[in-house]
Design a protein with these regions (language model features):
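Conserved phosphotransfer cores of two-component systems
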Residues: 43-45, 68-74, 96
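Acidic catalytic/metal-coordinating carboxylates
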Residues: 34-37, 60-64
Length: 121
């Protein structure tokens, strides 16, 4: 069984695409469509890494990131977002210390390589 990745995004098409790409590469994929759903699932089962969108209703990715990091300090976390401004990348990578910052649209090969690097495959 491959490494387990949690994908959190409020857009079902994005979740389905990322899930398909990662499962094709042998990863097991957990999904959540909101920050609250992600936190509930994390309490039951811990993945090897989490990929999360930034722009989500109710709890955005920045807030979700902080909540996950508080409780699961060593869990690799990456932002998966359309927000490609330098200020967003700086906040994600250097202020919050995300393990990666992946912008949409992303290439299949690039996504897989970056996830493998995060989980050390």
């Amino acid at each position: 069984m491959g490494k387990k990745i949690m994908v959190v995004d409020d857009e079902p098409d994005t979740v389905d695409l990322v899930k398909l790409v990662l499962e094709t590469e042998g990863f097991e994929v957990m999904t959540a469509f909101s920050g609250a759903e992600c936190l509930k699932k994390l309490a039951l089962e811990k993945p090897d890494a989490v990929l999360m969108d930034i722009m989500m209703p109710e709890m955005d990715g920045w807030e979700l990131f902080k909540k996950i990091r508080e409780k699961y300090k060593d869990l690799p976390l990456a932002m998966l977002t359309v927000r490609n401004r330098d200020i967003d990348k700086m906040l994600g990578l250097h202020v919050l210390k995300a393990d990666d910052y992946i912008t949409k649209p992303f290439g299949r090969k690039d996504l897989v390589e970056r996830v493998k690097k995060m989980v050390k495959v």
